[in-house]
């Protein structure tokens, strides 16, 4: 289960980074832009307005601290959901349950679950690309990295 309640320490850490220039405890698109620029990121006014709109539940045109916490929680939920789906897909392919996908397991999955089935050469190329530790198999970390890169 995903924990949507932040500890007091987490809230304090978030609050430290959540600073409004005028001290009103809300951040405008302009303040958000200035903060992001100080971190080396640059966005257009339209992009900043969209970022504000995405988490501005009271439609005030600014982000309050509580809205920022909810926005972070929502992103964490989405990430956790994706991660759990990656894990399920990996577990479905890992027939012997040893925590790595062998070439045989990957070939079985890619030749029976995908239309048209992938060739052995294409699957070998995927393994070569994803196999960071050179053991000829794909572990969970390599699998997630492969999925995210495709």
From Swiss-Prot:
Q: Which InterPro entries does the record associate with it?
A: Centrin_CML-like, EF-hand-dom_pair, EF_Hand_1_Ca_BS, EF_hand_dom
Ligand binding (Ca(2+) 3): 94, 96, 98, 105
Per UniProt, where does Ca(2+) 2 bind?
56, 58, 60, 62, 67
Q: Keyword Lipid biosynthesis on this protein?
A: no
Q: Where is the EF-hand domain?
A: 7-42, 43-78, 81-116, 118-150
Q: Which residues bind Ca(2+) 4?
A: 131, 133, 135, 137, 142
List every position bearing N-acetylalanine.
Answer: 1
A GO MF label? calcium ion binding
| Keywords for this protein | Acetylation, Calcium, Cytoplasm, Cytoskeleton, Metal-binding, Nucleus, Repeat
| PANTHER family membership | CALCIUM BINDING PROTEIN
Give the protein's function: May play an important role in mitosis of sea urchin egg. May function as a Ca(2+)-dependent intracellular modulator of microtubule assembly.
Q: Would you tell me the protein name for this molecule? A: 15 kDa calcium-binding protein
Source organism: Hemicentrotus pulcherrimus (Sea urchin)
């Amino acid at each position: 289960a995903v924990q949507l309640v932040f500890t007091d320490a987490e809230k304090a850490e978030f609050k430290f980074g959540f600073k409004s220039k005028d001290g009103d405890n809300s951040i405008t698109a302009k303040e958000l832009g200035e903060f992001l620029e100080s971190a080396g990121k640059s966005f257009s006014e339209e992009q900043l307005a969209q970022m504000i709109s995405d988490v501005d539940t009271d439609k005030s045109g600014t982000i309050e601290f509580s809205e920022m916490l909810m926005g972070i929680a929502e992103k964490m939920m989405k990430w956790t959901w994706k991660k759990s789906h990656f894990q399920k897909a990996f577990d479905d392919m890992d027939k012997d349950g040893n925590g790595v996908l062998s070439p045989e397991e990957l070939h079985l999955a890619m030749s029976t679950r995908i239309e048209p089935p992938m060739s052995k050469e294409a699957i070998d190329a995927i393994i070569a690309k994803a196999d960071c530790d050179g053991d000829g198999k794909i572990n969970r970390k390599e699998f997630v990295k492969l999925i995210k890169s495709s």
